[in-house]
């Protein structure tokens, strides 16, 4: 577990919002990511489109109808929510979006049970998380403050005395990679249909410096960088840095 407090995490959210306003290149790249998410939303279902752990709520720039939630009551958040104990009624949500959130779920089984409760039949969970290719291992392992967590056991369910209101800040950036790129957890995912597991190469994002690192190329170079992404995307084991996962709640 990463040894920082929830309060420190909220400070980072505030900092990220400032970086977002100062880095138009980052805005353009994130809109590409948000459009990938939008392409996988099931718009045929009635119900809310809800983002869990919205942070700065920038998803609304592409999906304005998204209901943005977070642990912290920042002014741009629609509703305060905890992934382990959602306030939404049963089967009231059509799509749940988790952008850089899955790797913060210390007990994914508990969260999935709650997601199953609030999602309509055939409702979707759309997960966008780090992908740990060779490049991803270098980038996230050496240049990011959150651990990859490959040496840690994934605890699917919380202990019996678990209090969802009182838990530490958890991060293991490799968890989506470990869970969705193998068959090891298929039994745990029995209630879900795996619609998509897509490896995304985004050197354009890595070289942008993200929120807090130095930007290594000007915004005008973005089309060229996207071309590089497309070329290197043929070798996801080496270069993929993002993982897009779409799960669908089984109707029976």
Report the location of each language-model feature.
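Conserved N-terminal segment of class I S-adenosyl-L-methionine
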Residues: 1-84, 243
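Short conserved loop adjoining the S-adenosyl-L-methionine
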Residues: 85-90
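A conserved beta-strand element that flanks and buttresses the S-adenosyl-L-methionine
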Residues: 97
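Short catalytic micro-motifs in class I SAM-dependent methyltransferases
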Residues: 100-101
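A short glycine-rich, Lys/Arg-flanked "PGG" loop and its adjoining helix->strand segment in the class I
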Residues: 109-124
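Conserved class I S-adenosyl-L-methionine
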Residues: 126-162
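Acceptor-substrate binding/catalytic loop of class I
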Residues: 164-183
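A C-terminal cap/extension of S-adenosyl-L-methionine-dependent methyltransferases
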Residues: 183, 187, 191-252
């Amino acid at each position: 577990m990463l040894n920082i407090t929830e309060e420190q995490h909220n400070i980072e959210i505030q900092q990220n919002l400032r970086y977002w306003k100062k880095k138009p290149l980052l805005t353009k790249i994130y809109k590409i990511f948000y459009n990938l998410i939008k392409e996988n939303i099931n718009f045929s279902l009635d119900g809310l489109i809800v983002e869990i752990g919205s942070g700065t709520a920038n998803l609304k720039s592409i999906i304005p109808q998204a209901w943005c939630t977070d642990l912290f009551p920042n002014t741009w958040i629609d509703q305060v929510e905890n992934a382990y104990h959602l306030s939404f009624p049963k089967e009231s949500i059509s799509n749940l979006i988790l952008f850089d959130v899955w790797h913060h779920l210390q007990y994914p089984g508990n969260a999935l049970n709650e997601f199953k409760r609030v999602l309509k039949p055939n409702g979707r969970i759309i997960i966008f998380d780090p992908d740990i290719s060779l490049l991803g291992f270098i980038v996230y392992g050496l240049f990011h403050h959150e651990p990859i967590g490959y040496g840690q056991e994934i605890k699917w369910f919380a202990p019996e005395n678990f209090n969802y209101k009182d838990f530490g800040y958890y991060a293991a950036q490799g968890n989506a990679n470990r869970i969705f790129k193998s068959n090891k957890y298929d039994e745990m995912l029995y209630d879900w249909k795996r619609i998509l597991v897509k490896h995304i190469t985004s050197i354009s994002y890595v070289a942008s410096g993200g929120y807090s690192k130095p930007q290594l190329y000007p915004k005008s170079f973005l089309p060229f960088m996207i071309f590089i992404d497309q070329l290197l995307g043929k070798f996801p084991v080496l270069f993929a840095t993002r993982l897009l996962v779409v799960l669908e709640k089984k109707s029976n």
